[in-house]
Amino acid sequence: MFYTVIWIFCATLLAILFGGVRKPKRFPPGPAWYPIVGSALQVSQLRCRLGMFCKVIDVFARQYVNPYGFYGLKIGKDKVVIAYTNDAISEMMTNEDIDGRPDGIFYRLRTFNSRLGVLLTDGEMWVEQRRFILRHLKNFGFARSGMMDIVHNEATCLLQDLKDKVLKSGGKQTRIEMHDLTSVYVLNTLWCMLSGRRYEPGSPEITQLLETFFELFKNIDMVGALFSHFPLLRFIAPNFSGYNGFVESHRSLYTFMSKEIELHRLTYKNYDEPRDLMDSYLRAQDEGNDEKGMFSDQSLLAICLDMFLAGSETTNKSLGFCFMHLVLQPEIQERAFQEIKEVVGLERIPEWSRDRTKLPYCEAITLEAVRMFMLHTFGIPHRAVCDTRLSGYEIPKDTMVIACFRGMLINPVDFPDPESFNPDRYLFDGHLKLPEAFNPFGFGRHRCMGDLLGRQNLFMFTTTVLQNFKMVAIPGQVPEEVPLEGATAAVKPYDIMLVAREQ
């Protein structure tokens, strides 16, 4: 009996260890799978050498050449398929069989061990939450003229704060940190609609919030974290695996948001109409029609977190790439300034609805900034909800499928000299014309619902700064073009001299 048990144990162990090394039939090409780790060792070695996960996919694209742009990995327990080209990304994002979001410890831990919110949910929960958000945010400016007013106000506040800093330094120029230059103002454009409040730069509360965001995004990526691929590590090495940091970051974020929700709970009944999305959500709870429990306090917290992450983080990072490249290429600053001066003048700041179409070079700058940011970035992961196919490859149920926008946006056919920052690539006879492969906001039902707000923020903050200031590199402290890796790529912190233009 004893030997029988030992034999069964050993056979089971071998099945676990070696059963996972066999790739599913017709799985997309990629590196070999090893027991327990899958292809994580190959990925890790290349990542250490190249610095970024997206560049690892560049290597695989050259090594495992196929005409479809799909590449297969296994990281720990997770099967992962990377969509690398424009056609591949379009196919995976419009395939209803791959319309799910991943499930597991990483995705549940962030939302109270449940699948809540709108960013990483699917099915009925995603449909109901997304519908509610879009319907009610429109009442508070989202996707309407009111949104332009909110963004215009924040751009005006940014301008005044920068002018005050220059004035305190003598009125001509000042040294400023470019890290998080616009973070508070961008966050305010969304937070005004969520909670009816805006924050001032430098307030301890918002400073702590932004630091928490920075740490969270620095220590994870879109595919997950070490503890999500190897769940046992959260018990064995909670710090090394990123588990403790992940939990603490979310605890801090939810503490901040819970305070705001409780303030709304105490006051929202004093008003005949909801003031913001939080009021609308609390009123929906009062109606008592939530038989499926989709409108809980935890769901509201998850939505606030998702809107924070999706709405402000990507815009801020794009602005970071924009300003870095403008500092490195002052001739682009001057050309944009001349366009603004001729079209808008210097008496008022540019406006989205009034001036955007007349400022094609300025808009081209923002488009190129988005490209430079997104070519270092992965999309939010999808999940195969059933066994399915992509370009003839077999994709098993629950496989994670994720877009690597780098392959799409660094394609030299659509983007000649793709590593260079060149707004002229979008201009033809003085008019904007987007390359066919320029699709950084995604496709299908999961296309970014905040793309309009993001584009308005980029345009307004960039043109407002360029109209009023020169951004000059400090000798010996030129910004580094190699970004920091994380859930989204970020420009490394640097300082500049901000020089006021003569009005």
UniProtKB/Swiss-Prot annotation:
- Any idea which GO molecular function terms this record carries? heme binding; iron ion binding; monooxygenase activity; oxidoreductase activity, acting on paired donors, with incorporation or reduction of molecular oxygen
UniProt cross-references to CDD domains, sorted A to Z = CYP15A1-like
What keywords are annotated for this sequence in UniProt?
Endoplasmic reticulum, Heme, Iron, Membrane, Metal-binding, Microsome, Monooxygenase, Oxidoreductase
The answer to keyword Oxidoreductase applying to this record is yes
Q: How does it sit in the membrane?
A: Peripheral membrane protein
Protein's UniProt keywords contain Iron:
yes
Paired cysteines (S-S): none
**Cofactor(s) annotated in UniProt:** heme
Compartments reported by the entry: Endoplasmic reticulum membrane; Microsome membrane
Which superkingdom, per the lineage?
Answer: Eukaryota
EC number from the UniProt entry: 1.14.-.-
Q: Which GO terms describe its biological process?
A: sensory organ development
Gene Ontology CC annotation, any one: endoplasmic reticulum membrane
| UniProt main location, coarse | endoplasmic reticulum
What the entry lists under Pfam families is as follows: p450
Per UniProt, heme binds at C448
Question: Record's family?
Answer: Belongs to the cytochrome P450 family.
Q: What does this protein do?
A: May be involved in the metabolism of insect hormones and in the breakdown of synthetic insecticides.
UniProt name for this protein: Probable cytochrome P450 303a1
The record lists the organism as Drosophila melanogaster (Fruit fly)
